[in-house]
Amino acid sequence: MEQRNHVSSRIFFVLLLFAVFTALTITRPVIAQPATHDPSEQHARKTQPDRQQREPALLAHRGLVRHCPENTLPAFAAAVELGLSIELDVYQTSDKQLVVIHDKTIDRTTNGSGEVTKMTLAEIRQLDAGSWFHSRYTGLKVPTLEEAFQLIRQRQRKPVTIALNMKVISPGIEANIARLVEKYNLLDQLFVFGQPEDSSQRFKQANPELRTTEVKIYDSEHFSRALKNPLADCLWVGFIPSRDEMAHARTLGKQVWLSLHIGAKRVDIWDQARASQMDGICTNWPLECRLHWRKQDSNLANGVNQR
């Protein structure tokens, strides 16, 4: 058994190195044609078996952040190459361009200074968004949301979920995002979260099929109320709902995503979320979570006591 687990670990690290090496090739925007609507493709996505139906999807928080600079094309490429879903953050610049970055200012993750919403795209694109993490990423640019969508469409082997975190609600941002989501045919893969209710209403006005989310749900009472919210296609929760609560959410067509101890390597939380059959987990440790589950499955198949 030790030898088998050792082999699993070696496979894990080989895959990781491959993904990061692939990500390092992302030095300029990926050029990809916007996808056209294909009803047969959409039907195939809805009917084909999907791991998400058997265990929670793993949302790589800001991409594969432990191995690449957060919210950059290499971080997203590495995640998608390994079949992970992605959580990312979006702002609108002063010239109404959509960029992917977490903080309100560019100070922490670039060599510049200033508020994202008060800068033009050209000003932001002059900055280095990679060397703060490691010298091999020197010259990396803050990506646009369109570049992120292009990359995901090009690199995904099967559809991955995109969780789009709304950081600041600038005028017109909902319609701009909706147009881009439609352009790349990502309505069935994406949901937006973090926005207030009036912003969710504007998203629905822009496109009724764009999934919006209620956040900051920390207990069963709030969970029950959120299930009745017509603007809550998804629930972003900070606790583990029971299996019965999850079953009820599914009957209502709601998805439930866990945002609890994102930065911590908490196998107990991962296991509880899996047992409850949650739709997904947002974490900085998606590969370690997947490996933990695969080892559990292997041990169970071989009759190994996991206590």
Q: Across the structure, where does each feature detected by a protein language model lie?
A:
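Hydrophobic faces of well-ordered beta-strands that scaffold small-molecule active sites
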Residues: 58-60, 86-88, 162-164, 190-192, ...
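Bacterial N-terminal signal peptides
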Residues: 13-25
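Conserved, mostly hydrophobic/aromatic
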Residues: 61, 79, 89, 124, ...
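C-terminal active-site rim and adjoining tail of enzyme catalytic domains
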Residues: 38, 43, 137, 213-307
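N-terminal secretory signal peptides that target proteins for export/translocation
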Residues: 1-9
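Metal-dependent phosphodiesterase/phospholipase catalytic core, i.e.
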Residues: 38-42, 102-210, 237-240, 252
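Catalytic domains of carbohydrate-active enzymes, especially glycoside hydrolases
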Residues: 75-92, 229-235
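Long, acidic (Asp/Glu-rich), low-complexity accessory segments flanking structured domains
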Residues: 33-66, 130, 137-140
